[in-house]
């Protein structure tokens, strides 16, 4: 074995499919046996201690991605990235270890490391609880080079705390190794993410894969027949045509002066909520800089509804990121360098993190209302409702309600940009 080898870690967020679907489409065939898990917040408060950190990490990472380019869509899973790196930190020491946890927004003088990992353990357990109306699954996979001897404690901890599976791979056969990893991801995301790994270094001895898959249906769906082509203003000079979903009804929507934005909360059947932020003219950067965990918490606690005429674009976007540069801006650098200390993973050879790849896919549409037999009637006040059109760049979050954790975050600059 060479004296210096690379460790490829692959981070993946699977499909965020904001799509109403019929329960008959449940691929597991066990929808009737699933149960609601709304009580978990009281039973397992451990994850409450890490949720604010995950939210602030999400906003920090988002701002870095937005800073890199203001003309492209953004979509990523904060939970997926944080889970993978927190799991990796179990095998790191000294500065390498501290940089990772501090980069994930944890202050080690305020929260013991054991509570961080216990928080992730409870978070993953709660996210993977069956729900009759929502498909949400996460997975962690360790792909180990044949003959590589891991430190027993590291292997025990990642299995116990992060519910990780371990697989043996011949990284010398790069094509077969790629296929094994990509097949694992494709299966976990129900075919929505394929060929995640494009290239694999022959010196790779260890790969870590995390995925998250979400599929839900709106609590109050849109009618397909009401969707029409409308203009979306990418910037002051660029306009594109997009299919715009429309509905007149009662919404949890308000105009927030602090954010200079309209804020719309839309629930899914089950325990998830999407939050859309439509900034006032010229206020997108202001919105991006002002988002905090406390503000999001206040919006989630607000149940006030008002009438509005809502226009929301259908879209399908993909976010693919090499996280090395963006995480470097958050202070996570040592693990990618020759000075990395990953001796808690294996003592056989010095390791460093060679690659961190993250991919996420998003679809928003109104399909499935007829298949689900959905019909919803509501009374609308006689006063003229405001017309809120998401026809210019906007920001959104997907929150799991039990844990208040940020499953996904993104920005739509151009809905036609794949």
Swiss-Prot record:
InterPro entries: Serpin_CS, Serpin_dom, Serpin_fam, Serpin_sf, Serpin_sf_1, Serpin_sf_2. It is found in: Secreted; Endoplasmic reticulum. Inhibitor of serine proteases. Its primary target is elastase, but it also has a moderate affinity for plasmin and thrombin. Irreversibly inhibits trypsin, chymotrypsin and plasminogen activator. The aberrant form inhibits insulin-induced NO synthesis in platelets, decreases coagulation time and has proteolytic activity against insulin and plasmin. One of its GO terms (molecular function) is identical protein binding. It comes from the Eukaryota. The modification Phosphoserine is found at residues 38, 383. N-glycosylated. Differential glycosylation produces a number of isoforms. N-linked glycan at Asn-107 is alternatively di-antennary, tri-antennary or tetra-antennary. The glycan at Asn-70 is di-antennary with trace amounts of tri-antennary. Glycan at Asn-271 is exclusively di-antennary. Structure of glycans at Asn-70 and Asn-271 is Hex5HexNAc4. The structure of the antennae is Neu5Ac(alpha1-6)Gal(beta1-4)GlcNAc attached to the core structure Man(alpha1-6)[Man(alpha1-3)]Man(beta1-4)GlcNAc(beta1-4)GlcNAc. Some antennae are fucosylated, which forms a Lewis-X determinant. Proteolytic processing may yield the truncated form that ranges from Asp-30 to Lys-418. GO terms for cellular component: collagen-containing extracellular matrix; COPII-coated ER to Golgi transport vesicle; endoplasmic reticulum; endoplasmic reticulum lumen; endoplasmic reticulum-Golgi intermediate compartment membrane; extracellular exosome; extracellular region; extracellular space. Changing residue 116 to N: In QO-Ludwigshafen. Its main location: secreted. Changing residue 180 to E: In L-Frankfurt. The keyword Signal applies. This is Alpha-1-antitrypsin. The modification S-cysteinyl cysteine is found at residue 256. The record marks 352-355 as: (Microbial infection) Cleavage. Residues 368-392 are annotated as: RCL. The aberrant form is found in the plasma of chronic smokers, and persists after smoking is ceased. It can still be found ten years after smoking has ceased. It is linked to Alpha-1-antitrypsin deficiency: A disorder whose most common manifestation is emphysema, which becomes evident by the third to fourth decade. A less common manifestation of the deficiency is liver disease, which occurs in children and adults, and may result in cirrhosis and liver failure. Environmental factors, particularly cigarette smoking, greatly increase the risk of emphysema at an earlier age. GO terms for biological process: acute-phase response; blood coagulation. Pfam families: Serpin (PF00079). Belongs to the serpin family. Ubiquitous. Expressed in leukocytes and plasma.
């Amino acid at each position: 074995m060479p004296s210096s080898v690379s460790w490829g870690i692959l981070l993946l967020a699977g499909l965020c499919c904001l799509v109403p679907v019929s329960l008959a489409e449940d691929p597991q065939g066990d929808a009737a046996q699933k149960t609601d898990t709304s009580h978990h917040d009281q039973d397992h408060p451990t994850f409450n201690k890490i949720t604010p950190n995950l939210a602030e990490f999400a906003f920090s990472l988002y701002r870095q991605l937005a800073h890199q380019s203001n003309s492209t869509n953004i979509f990523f899973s904060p939970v997926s990235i944080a889970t993978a790196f927190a799991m990796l930190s179990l095998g790191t020491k000294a500065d390498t270890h501290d940089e990772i946890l501090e980069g994930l927004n944890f202050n080690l003088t305020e929260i013991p490391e054991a509570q961080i990992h216990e928080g992730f353990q409870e978070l993953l357990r709660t996210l993977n609880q069956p729900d009759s109306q929502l498909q949400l699954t996460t997975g962690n996979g360790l792909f180990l080079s044949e003959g590589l001897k891991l430190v027993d404690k590291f292997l025990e901890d990642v299995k116990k705390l992060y519910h990780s599976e371990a697989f043996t791979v011949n990284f010398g056969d790069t094509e077969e190794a790629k296929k094994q990893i990509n097949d694992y991801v494709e299966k976990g995301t129900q075919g929505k993410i394929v060929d995640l790994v494009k290239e694999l270094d022959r010196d790779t001895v260890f790969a870590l894969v995390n995925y998250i898959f979400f599929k839900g249906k709106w609590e109050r769906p849109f009618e397909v027949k009401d969707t029409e082509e409308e203009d979306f203003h990418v910037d002051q000079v660029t306009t594109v045509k997009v299919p715009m979903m429309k509905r007149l009804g009662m919404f949890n929507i308000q105009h927030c002066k602090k954010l200079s934005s309209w804020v719309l909360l839309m629930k899914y059947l089950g325990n998830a909520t999407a939050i859309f932020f439509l900034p006032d003219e010229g206020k997108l950067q202001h919105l991006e800089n002002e988002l905090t965990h406390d503000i999001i918490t206040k919006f989630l606690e607000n149940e006030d509804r008002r009438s509005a005429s809502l226009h929301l674009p259908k879209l399908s976007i993909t976010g693919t990121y090499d996280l090395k540069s963006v995480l470097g801006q958050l202070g996570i650098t040592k693990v990618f360098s020759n000075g990395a200390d990953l001796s808690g993973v294996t003592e056989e050879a010095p390791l460093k993190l060679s690659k961190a790849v993250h991919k996420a896919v998003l679809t928003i549409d109104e399909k499935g209302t007829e298949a689900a037999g959905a019909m919803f009637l509501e009374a609308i006040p006689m006063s003229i409702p405001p017309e809120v059109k998401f026809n210019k760049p906007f920001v959104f979050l997907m929150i799991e309600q039990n844990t208040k954790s940020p499953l996904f975050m993104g920005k739509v600059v151009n809905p036609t940009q794949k």
